Amino acid sequence: MMDGASPVDRDVSPVGLPKKRIKQNHDQVFLHNLPDAPRYTKSYMHNAEIYKCFPTKSNYILSVSYDGYVKFWHKTPNGVEYIKEFHAHNAMLLSAELSQDERLFITGADDKSLKVFDVESIDLVNIIDLEFLPKAICCFNSPSLKTSLIAVSSAESPLIFFFESGGDGEVLYTVKKHTAPVHCLRYLSTLDCFLSIDIGGMVEYWSPEEPFQKPDTAELFNMKSQTDLYIFKKQKSVPTSLEVSHFENFWSTISYPDCKVRVFDTKSGRAILELDENPSNAAKKVEALFEKEDTESSYYMSHVELGRRIAIERDIEKHGLTVGTTAIFDESEKYLLYGSIVGIKVVSIDNGTVVRIYGKDEAVRFTRLSLYQQAPKKSNLPSLDVIASNNPLVEESFQKDPTLFATAWKKQRFYLFSNMSTKFTLSDRDVYNEQVLPVTNNEGRQENGNILLGKAAIIHTTQGDISIKLYPEEAPKAVQNFTTHAENGYYDNTIFHRIIKNFMIQGGDPLGDGTGGESIWKKDFEDEISPNLKHDRPFTVSMANSGPNTNGSQFFITTDLTPWLDGKHTIFARAYAGLDVVHRIEQGETDKYDRPLEPTKIINISIVYT
């Protein structure tokens, strides 16, 4: 004790020992700043599959879809309100990103252009024409360069080009740090350096100034050999995305084909957390839970549902770098959030435990995530009188409204997870803010008035994909009916309800028992018997019926020669790939009524128009 200290400064505990400092556990506080609703509370539409949502601290939400549309929304306590939209590109979107200060939003498309938006004024402020296809975009303010720059990697070379955000499109300088195109690019303001990953899995740290080397600072690792930055090369896997935490202490990746989620310490370059999300491991967990009859586990699901989800995971893995599944951090840097086969997991970075799961019971696979942890209502300069007024409206304006924004695999909606206090019902949470059309207006579709005819289709099932060639010239009505039903999701999650070995597999009934289904015209339509098409080979796709001119929605795929069906059933397609999938479905066990004991589900059907 210091000389002259008063008795009140002394430790006067009865045991005569110093009091232990109580270590406060803030985990519950940090979790309180995350949404607590297990299911999504709202969803909103675009007319095409959505790339990502970008929430800002100024309460603007930006959503962008692959057809080049950018929508501005305003965050409200009960969701979002639409403000304005731009048709930024008449081409397929390739990349989009917010600037670090959230003032600018940049999009890039395969029309070889960048569009620059001012977020606060909600306006398109610049167009930059490129001589290359853009890949990754990063808009940053470097203290050493004292200006706002846009870094854009080329999809065709390892080069990264730098432009002024408000400039005339002149290339300021070019950097080559990789031997393959760079698809992940982030600027670390705390270190004034870039973090980049190429499509070969190589990771680099480098300064935005010449000679573009790793910053010479004691905060960073000395040699790359001391880090885990070669891990993707060693595992022969490539990250699909790169996310940096709020204070830039960590960064995360999701890589394929090893299906690993990793968290790295920024300064040491070491992997501090590795999570295995391989679908085969999930299948093993489900089997073990079935044996234990553990229905409380997050991995518990039926075999049919497991098959459906594994098929989606394999589809995502097959598309690789184009998926861009993300693993994001909360603002406290305590938790990592990412989509998985069982929903969106919230994982503790300290020990890797799953503390929360969102969307386990939803039928979609969530991919790109973004987190809003602000208060949707703000008073610019509240007075002391206002703060002390105990007015519930004032209190509400200062309350945080944590909201998780998620896009989903092959979906035209973005989804909001918020708090349980948000009132919603499952029947009205999906907002139809766009006109629901039979088919979205993508390039390459055959249009004749309102008639839309596909050239081919891919039937995504829980056993795998079946590709079929359509015959719009021979059976235009049957193809139109099948195409429109597929695009509208009519066949989604239906089953192959009737299986007869050495004959056929039948599906297309939303009731799942062979008694339901109707055409897009709400009535039976006539047969289209073509002399050019016969049931003279297996894998012929025909309309099921109950007599002449009674076609609805059901169809079947033959597995052998069936000449007795000629003249009785409309042939509108033939399978040309995934024939093994057809055989696997055919070989499934059935009851005496030809109903499968473990039905194969149709996840959805993709239509090809070119």
Swiss-Prot record:
Residue ranges of WD repeats: 45-83, 88-127, 177-216
Catalytic reaction equation(s): [protein]-peptidylproline (omega=180) = [protein]-peptidylproline (omega=0)
Enzyme Commission no? 5.2.1.8
- Subcellular location as annotated: Nucleus
Listed Gene3D superfamilies:
Cyclophilin-like, YVTN repeat-like/Quinoprotein amine dehydrogenase
GO molecular function per UniProt: peptidyl-prolyl cis-trans isomerase activity
Listed name of the protein: Peptidyl-prolyl cis-trans isomerase 9
